[in-house]
Structures are given as C-alpha cells and as structure tokens.
Curated annotation (Swiss-Prot):
TM segment ranges: none
Protein name: Aliphatic amidase
Origin organism lineage: Bacteria, Bacillati, Bacillota, Bacilli, Bacillales
NCBIfam families: PRK13286.1
Protein purpose: Catalyzes the hydrolysis of short-chain aliphatic amides to their corresponding organic acids with release of ammonia. Also exhibits in vitro acyl transferase activity, transferring the acyl moiety of short-chain amides to hydroxylamine to form hydroxamates.
Domain named CN hydrolase: residues: 13-260
UniProt xrefs under PANTHER family: ALIPHATIC AMIDASE (PTHR43674:SF14), NITRILASE C965.09-RELATED (PTHR43674)
Enzyme Commission code: 3.5.1.4
Temperature dependence: Thermostable up to at least 50 degrees Celsius.
Gene: amiE
Keywords: Hydrolase
Keyword Hydrolase in annotation: yes
Length: 348
C-alpha cells in the first residue's frame, strides 16, 4: 500500500477518488452536459496520474439530487444509455476503469415504479462490467426503488471489486456480504452531507478493518441549495488506516496505490486479526485443546440472522417492538410518509 506518488505497478492498482461538487440540475440536457464534464475530468486526470487504473466519482455526481419528482422520472436513464456511452468513451480514451453514478436508472416498469439509485463499473475497454443498485436507500428522504444484491467483479489487474452506495455503508451486513463473496476493494460512492461527517469517516475505516478489505470512498462537496456536502473522499488500507484523504475542497482528488499481493497474503497468513477466517472457525484454539478437531465452529451463533433468513416478517415484528411500527413518526412528520398519527405532548 503506497501513497504520495503518481505511479502504479504490476502489483498495485492506482485508485483516484473525487470530491465532485454536487450539481443542481433539472433537465436531461443538463445531465448530458455534466456527464461530458465528468468524462473530460477522467481524461485530464489520467494525464496527471499516469498510474491511475481506477477513478471513482460520488453518488449523484452525474445528475445531482432531483428534488422534484417529475424531474427525477424525466431524467431517469437507461443502462446502457447516453450517459454511460459518454463515460465508456472516456474510460477507453484514458485507458482506465471508472465508477459512475446514475440517479436514477429507469425501473423495468418505468414510469409506474420509482427509479433505482445505480452505480456502474466500466472497464478500460468501455464495457459495463458491474451494475449495482442501492440496496438500502436513505429513507425517508430518498425515494429510490431498492436493489436486492451485491456483486463482485474482477477489476484492473485482477483486483476483486464490489460497489455500494452511501447509506448502504451504515450497515455492517453489506460490507461483510461483499467481503465474504471475495471483494478485495469495496467502493462506496456517497452524496453524504453534514451533520454526519465524523460518523461516515469512522464507518469506512472501521469496515475496512473489520473485513480485511481496501475501501475507496468518493463523496460530494459543495451546497446544492438544500444540503451541504462534506467531501473527505478517501482510500483506506485493509488495516483500517487511511492512505489518502481529501478535505472539503470542491473537485479535490486523492490518489493511492493498493497492493494486490499484500491483501491476498494477509488473508492467507494473518492470524489474530483475520476476521473473515475466524468468523467461520470460531474458537479453534479452544477446540484443539479440547480434542474436538482443528477447524473451530462454523455454525452461525446469531439469533437475529437466523430469524431474518428463516422468517423475515418475524424479524421485522421483533425490530418494531424495540423501535416503532410505522415508517414515519408524528413527532417529526415528513410529507407522504405514514406515521402513527399521534402528536407529542409538550413536556412529555
């Protein structure tokens, strides 16, 4: 793992993350014009970072947040489509891979269903090699149709890559799912705003450590008339330490190299902190000392996960007992979100 140079090697993947200024757009024509700006940025960045194998742009960087629902549906994209064609050409021209945001992607039943919040991974030949739909939209604000699975794709130089989006990253389950599928780099594209800056920086570092994985975060910056975005795009090592991190500057770029051999060596040979291995070989030292074999315990010990898999409605019922039974709350009502219909009494 290296930081400070502009190169890469046969063993390292050069990764750039961008603090892209959050655009405020309203029409398809504006979206296309902005996509061309992103494409120009990709080509320009490769001139300055000749080792760049992968560039990552934030959630909402292509379209911005469409606060008007009619605009959201009108600008929803097909994949492949005009936007991805622009990005594909840039990746070919720059001989680099890229991760780009489409907010949103037309639902199969468009316009009767809400669009998806989608990322695409495009290789240096201009091919879409991964399309990920955000599994956990940022409710109650985001109105995207939820996706349903994560993916792992062999990326530049064979590095295995998963994509996740913004609020996905607040749930340890999604990181673990990607890592257990073999991801060596988890890319988190986000359009995260204040006040959650410290929490999001902490979460990315903790999940890199907990899952023995590289993490690349690309976050928005600037003010779009509604939210202020804190940037801090970063590349994080599989030991949870930051290799490179932006500040809050608009269109800031950070760059680092991640070693393919180092992460594979760690996952094979690390012992006390090999979290992926130890989770499925629990207590192996104690079982060896007890004459019960040398592989530890594989069975899942967590009741919540067993219930969720075997009876999802029961798991939902259980969580509502410790939270609430409606998606909204009357103490802070949001238009269009049902709540329990009670109003908080002053002083209670």
């Amino acid at each position: 793992m290296r930081h400070g140079d502009i190169s890469s090697s046969h063993d390292t993947v050069g990764i750039a993350v961008v603090n892209y200024k959050m655009p405020r757009l309203h029409t398809k024509a504006e979206v296309i014009e902005n996509a061309k700006k992103i494409a120009d940025m990709v080509v320009g960045m490769k001139q300055g970072l000749p080792g760049m194998d992968l560039v990552v742009f934030p959630e909402y960087s292509t379209m911005g947040i469409m606060y008007d629902q009619d605009e959201m549906f009108a600008t929803a994209a097909s994949i492949p489509g005009e936007e991805t064609a622009i990005f594909a050409e840039a990746c070919k021209k720059a001989d680099t891979w890229g991760v780009f945001s489409l907010t949103g992607e037309k639902h199969e039943d468009h316009p009767n269903k809400a669009p998806y919040n989608t990322l695409v991974l495009i290789n240096n030949k201009g091919e879409i090699v991964q399309k990920y739909r955000k599994i956990i939209p940022w409710c109650p604000i985001e109105g995207w149709y939820p996706g349903d699975t994560t993916y792992v794709t062999e990326g530049p130089k064979g590095l295995k890559i998963s994509l996740i989006v913004c609020d996905d990253g607040n749930y340890p389950e999604i990181w673990r799912d990607c890592a257990m599928k073999g991801a060596e780099l988890i890319v988190r594209c986000q359009g995260y705003m204040y006040p959650a800056k410290e929490q999001q920086i902490m979460m990315a570092k903790a999940m890199a450590w907990a899952n023995n994985t590289y993490v690349a975060v690309a976050n928005a910056t600037g003010f779009d008339g509604v939210y202020s975005y804190f940037g801090h795009s970063a590349i994080i090592g599989f030991d949870g330490r930051t290799l490179g991190e932006c500040g809050t500057e608009e269109n800031g770029i950070q760059y680092a190299e991640v070693s393919i051999s180092q992460i594979r060596d760690f996952r094979k040979n690390a012992q006390s902190q090999n979290h992926l291995f130890k989770l499925l070989h629990r207590g192996y030292t104690g079982l060896i000392n007890s004459g019960e074999g040398d592989r530890g315990v594989a069975e899942c010990p967590f009741d919540f996960y067993r219930t969720w898999v075997l009876d999802a409605e029961k798991a939902r019922e259980n969580v509502e007992k410790i939270t609430r039974s409606t998606v909204g709350t009357a103490e802070c009502p949001i238009q269009g979100i049902p709540n329990e219909g009670k109003t908080k009494e002053i002083g209670v």
